[in-house]
Swiss-Prot record:
This is Arabinose 5-phosphate isomerase GutQ. GO terms for molecular function: arabinose-5-phosphate isomerase activity; ATP binding; metal ion binding. It catalyses: D-arabinose 5-phosphate = D-ribulose 5-phosphate. It comes from Salmonella typhi. Residues 34-177 form the SIS domain. Pfam families: CBS, SIS.
Length: 321
């Protein structure tokens, strides 16, 4: 029984891969035309399709939207019952139908022509009514479905998804869409956390900032170290400009060397220690701490004045790993 299941699964994958392997050679003028129509679209891309094509269409619309192309999915039945009103002349419709003869097209195509909406087709029948009406046809045809009965859309839905990805990625690259653009549309994701957060978004502020003045004694600096638990204290002048840092390591070295606790901390600190700019990207700041093998640092403004403090745990808690 297990061998039969494994063989069926492997056969399905092999058939789907075989059909998908034919897609690259089909990309030509129509693919370029479709991509350019989307690139120059001043409105939105509306993706539509019925059944399994509709399910894949939702994914294609989501991929376009998350990679810099305003897009959404409209079900053909809903389009014919009012949602066509959302479609304007500056929009583009990408209709997915393997047969290219969905009955809804008989009503949708004339309405699109009335509105001068550019129609793109993704179909297995390029010479179907859908293919003939479209400005560009993306051929997703297969010689056979992976379904043993040749009925359930399998190879054809894989081809549809792959063609949609190919189109979305080509448009994305042509737009110059980059990681930061992607992060802006995914602010709650890991990439958004990595690229959108600056140090000032994550740093500790107010009473949570460990700080002392240059004339503060080593004893009082030690108490400040203990109070905040960050492993360092920022040592500032009277204008709150950071002049150095006093760390747990500095304290140990001072005591081992016989230093007095009444001595000003300015004599025991590390002068000109690492500081982070409040406006710098959090991911860059975290990588700097890792590179220098330190766990925390004061945060300063453009004038070097203390505005906060941050440690590696603050980055990790924000999802910046």
């Amino acid at each position: 029984m297990s061998d039969a299941l494994l063989n069926a699964g492997r056969q399905t994958l092999m058939l789907e891969l075989q059909e998908a392997s034919r897609l690259p050679e089909r990309l030509g003028d129509d693919f370029v035309r479709a991509a350019n129509i989307i690139i120059h679209c001043e409105g939105k891309v509306i993706v539509s399709g019925i059944g399994k094509s509709g399910h894949i269409g939702k994914k294609i619309a989501a991929t376009l939207a998350s990679t810099g192309t305003p897009a959404f999915f409209v079900h053909p039945a809903e389009a014919l019952h009012g949602d066509l009103g959302m479609i304007e002349s500056r929009d583009v419709m990408l209709f997915i139908s393997y047969s290219g003869g969905a009955k809804e097209l008989d009503l949708i195509i004339p309405r699109l022509e009335d509105k001068s909406v550019a129609l793109l087709a993704m179909t297995g029948k390029p010479h179907s009514p859908l293919g003939r009406a479209a400005k560009a046809v993306l051929d997703i045809s297969v010689e056979r479905e992976a379904c043993p009965m040749h009925l359930a859309p399998t190879s054809s839905t894989v081809n549809t998804l792959m063609m949609g990805d190919a189109l979305a990625m080509a448009v994305m690259q042509a737009r110059g869409f980059n990681e930061e653009d992607f992060a802006r549309s995914h602010p709650a994701g890991a990439l958004g956390a990595r690229l959108l957060n600056n140090v000032h978004h994550l740093m500790r502020q107010g009473d949570a900032i460990p700080q002392v003045m240059l004339a503060t004694s080593v004893m009082d600096a030690m108490l400040e170290l203990s109070r905040t638990g960050l492993g360092l204290v920022a040592v500032c002048d009277e204008q709150h400009v950071v002049k150095g840092v006093f760390t747990d390591g500095d304290l140990r070295r001072w005591l081992v060397g016989g230093g007095a606790l009444t001595t000003p901390v300015s004599e025991a600190m590390t002068p000109n220690g690492i500081t982070l700019q409040a406006q710098s990207r959090a991911i860059d700041a975290k990588e700097l701490l890792m590179k220098r093998k330190i766990t925390a640092a004061p945060v300063v403004d453009e004038n070097g004045k203390l505005t906060g403090a941050i440690n590696l745990q603050d980055f990790y808690q924000a999802g910046i790993i």
